Curated annotation (Swiss-Prot):
This is Small ribosomal subunit protein uS10. It comes from the Bacteria. GO terms for molecular function: structural constituent of ribosome; tRNA binding. The keyword Ribonucleoprotein applies. The gene is rpsJ. Involved in the binding of tRNA to the ribosomes. It comes from Mycolicibacterium smegmatis (strain ATCC 700084 / mc(2)155). Belongs to the universal ribosomal protein uS10 family. Keywords: Ribonucleoprotein, Ribosomal protein. Part of the 30S ribosomal subunit.
Length: 101
């Protein structure tokens, strides 16, 4: 698999879970002998929702809720078959979305 690259994108609402998952992926890949670039922090996506507190009137009284989506990017250069097998077996939390390209 010389000259190839695996790109892993991680998404999560909890920054601690995504950092722990990225650390686990980097440790696994370096143990198998491939080189790693990252984890590169990508811009955090922030969604703000505005809700009226009262069920009927008092539109001036509002509440804001936000959801932050943290993202990380990891590139694996020159992966070996052992690296791919180790990545398939790695156990990550369910709260972390993994996209492998």
């Amino acid at each position: 698999m010389a000259g190839q690259k695996i790109r892993i994108r991680l998404k999560a609402y909890d920054h601690e879970a995504i950092d722990a998952s990225a650390r686990k992926i980097v440790e696994t890949v370096t143990r198998t002998g491939a080189s790693v670039v990252g984890p590169v922090p990508l811009p955090t996506e922030k969604n703000v929702y505005c809700v009226i507190r009262s069920p009927h009137k008092y539109k001036d009284s509002r509440e804001h809720f936000e959801m932050r989506t943290h993202k990380r990017l990891i590139d694996i250069l020159d992966p070996t078959p052992k690296t791919v097998d180790a990545l398939m077996r790695i156990d990550l939390p369910a709260s972390v979305d993994v996209n492998i390209q």
